[in-house]
Regions:
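Bacterial N-terminal signal peptides that target proteins for export
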Residues: 1-13
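Bacterial N-terminal signal peptides
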Residues: 11-23
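Acidic, contiguous N-terminal accessory segments
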Residues: 31, 36-195, 389-396, 403-405, ...
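Conserved, mostly hydrophobic/aromatic
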Residues: 85, 106, 161, 205, ...
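Feature activates predominantly on carbohydrate-active enzymes
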Residues: 142-323, 331-333, 341-351, 477-479
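Hydrophobic faces of well-ordered beta-strands that scaffold small-molecule active sites
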Residues: 203-207, 234-236, 293-297, 352-354, ...
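Active-site neighborhood of glycoside hydrolase catalytic domains
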Residues: 306, 311-406, 411-425
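Flexible, acidic glycine-rich loops studded with aromatic residues
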Residues: 401, 413-548
Length: 548
């Protein structure tokens, strides 16, 4: 029998062994059976959180990504119109946005419009508690994004930071969504205790918006979609060029627009740009879903937009001409630093990407040494502005390249395909070419998209010293002018199936059963068929993620 809410508050105080200290008026309220007290001490740790609760019968919920550790309880925890979202008062400011976001998502999933209570209050049956005070052995394991989830008479979501609490809310919402009830009326979850931490620090999707502009609304939808599956980085490749059918540069584009006249030449011929207001909107949505936006200005190669805006720094050895800027000219570094300096105040991410790939070195005036010197100097400029530097890897840059740079490995041929950048002293992210999508491109760049089953089965299972610190799947638009297609239809259709799988392999890796056998992705796909794009995305309602 479920104990009435009016009684649960007082019983929980007694059972917690001093969770709430009562005196004077509080003691009188307790004796009379009146409403909850106005003050409570810090929420006590439960037996499950301290590792002292016996395991029950409930199976591990098949949320995506799957949980690292699960101790099943018995029975279910239900929420109703009397439930509340309780925020530990000491964490009220830090968790205000997370609580509000969760409140809105929970209403979509369950139909419940629950109040947020940030004053001290004792949890009653069916309440949901958000706290930045982790318990027991899990406290040392959680890092910046991990969390614990205790589901008994009420739900307690704990983490060391707001990101971890957000991810705990996404897990709880997914558990609700998988309860078998009608859409918008999910009210029950299995009881149990989970501890969950990510495999990779960087869990990324990259969009080439330089060659093909993506609307703000499309990017906003993907930020929400990514947060649902615990992906935390949207890498935007903001400048590039695309060839016309005659082989010339039909488009050379940089997608950010400054109001200053000295940067007017960077506005592309198609006029499709992101203004400061556009960028601020995306950053706000990203923050709500704990996704960071990493901007990339790719130079000295892929820099046709910079060459068009400032012809004096163009490299003359290109075919076709006008796609590269000359790293040997002092004016080149000065100009690129000025562009970064103009837009750095827009960016909330501590990391910026400087490109650095595919330059026609060792011909004309450009050598490998001059390329590396340019990249090192640009990187030091950005570091002086308190930014971390990320770039595309190239083994020819060794050993001169600054070891503080984060490397994205992308080359999937020859000896470089297996290079371990950690052995060379670098933090690195796996961005292997096998996980590119190039619409209308060659077969080895997945022109028909990436299936979640393939990504799940074939992504590297390396651990320890051989493992990267992050993973990324990418959409490149090399053929933007050769075929007519849109982000909303073509690109989403090619990418959508891989997004939940990317969340799985970047956060958890492959799932294994009790016997240590790899769980087939088809089992996880059954959950994806229900979870879809998440409670915040309606844009792709006519393009569901397939059930098989």
């Amino acid at each position: 029998m479920r104990i009435p809410r009016s009684m649960t508050s007082w019983l929980s105080m007694l059972l917690a062994g001093g969770l709430v200290a009562l005196g004077g008026q509080g003691a009188a309220l307790a004796a009379s059976g009146a409403s909850r007290p106005a003050a409570a001490a810090q929420l006590a740790c439960s037996e499950a959180e301290l590792g002292q609760a016996p395991a029950g019968a409930n199976a591990k919920p098949m949320v995506i990504p799957t949980l690292r550790d699960w101790t099943g309880g018995n029975g279910t925890l239900s929420f109703d119109a009397g439930s509340r979202i309780l925020v530990d008062p000491t964490d009220a400011a830090a968790l205000a946005d997370t609580a509000t976001q969760f409140q809105a998502q929970l209403k979509t999933v369950s139909g419940l419009a629950l109040p947020i209570v940030s004053r001290a209050a004792t949890p009653a049956a069916g309440d949901i508690v958000l706290s930045l005070a982790p318990c027991g052995a899990s406290a040392a394991q959680l890092g910046e994004e991990g969390y614990s989830l205790d589901l008994e008479d009420h739900a307690v979501l704990r983490a060391k930071g707001a990101a971890g609490v957000f991810y705990a809310t996404q897990t709880l919402l997914q558990m609700l969504s998988l309860d078998g009830a009608a859409a918008g009326a999910h009210l029950r979850v299995a009881r149990g205790f989970a501890v969950d931490v990510p495999r990779y620090a960087e869990r990324s999707i990259m969009f080439d918006v330089g060659r093909k502009y993506a609307s703000v609304d499309f990017l906003a939808a993907y930020l929400r979609f990514m947060g649902w599956y615990k992906l935390n980085t949207l890498h935007l490749h903001l400048n590039d060029q695309a060839k016309a059918k005659d082989g010339s540069w039909g488009l050379r584009a940089f997608r950010l627009k400054s109001d200053k006249p000295e940067f007017a030449g960077l506005v592309p011929a198609d006029g499709l740009v992101y203004t400061r207001d556009d960028w601020d909107k995306l950053e706000t949505i990203a923050a709500a879903h704990h996704v960071r936006i990493v901007p990339e200005f790719d130079t000295p190669g892929h820099a046709g937009a910079f060459a068009a805006a400032n012809p004096a720094i163009a490299y003359v050895g290109d075919t076709p001409p006008g796609g590269t800027i000359d790293p040997t000219k002092p004016a080149t570094l000065q100009y690129v630093e000025s562009v970064f300096g103009e837009f750095l105040p827009w960016f909330r991410s501590s990391t910026v990407h400087i490109g650095g790939d595919e330059v026609n070195v060792n011909s004309g005036s450009i050598t490998t040494a001059s390329q590396v010197d340019y990249l090192n100097q640009l990187g030091r400029f950005l570091q002086s502005r308190h930014r971390r530097v990320e770039m595309w890897g190239d083994a020819s840059y060794l050993p001169r390249l600054d070891k503080s740079f984060i490397i994205q490995r992308w080359i999937n041929w020859g000896s470089e395909a297996s290079i371990n950048w950690a052995d060379k002293g670098y933090q690195w992210t796996e961005s292997y070419g096998d996980w590119y999508i190039v619409p209308f491109g060659p077969s080895y760049f997945n022109p028909d998209g990436i299936k979640g089953d393939t990504l799940y089965a074939k992504w590297s299972q390396a651990t320890g010293a051989n493992a990267p610190s992050g993973g990324q799947i990418a959409v490149w638009n090399d053929n933007a002018l050769l075929d007519s297609y849109t982000w909303e239809r073509k690109v989403n259709d090619l990418l959508k199936d891989a997004v939940p799988a990317a969340g799985q392999v970047f956060w958890r890796g492959q799932e294994h059963d009790a016997q240590g056998q790899t769980v087939d992705y088809g089992v996880l796909r059954r959950s994806v068929a229900t979870l879809q794009y998440g409670p915040d995305v309606t844009r792709f309602s006519d393009s569901p993620i397939p059930a098989r």
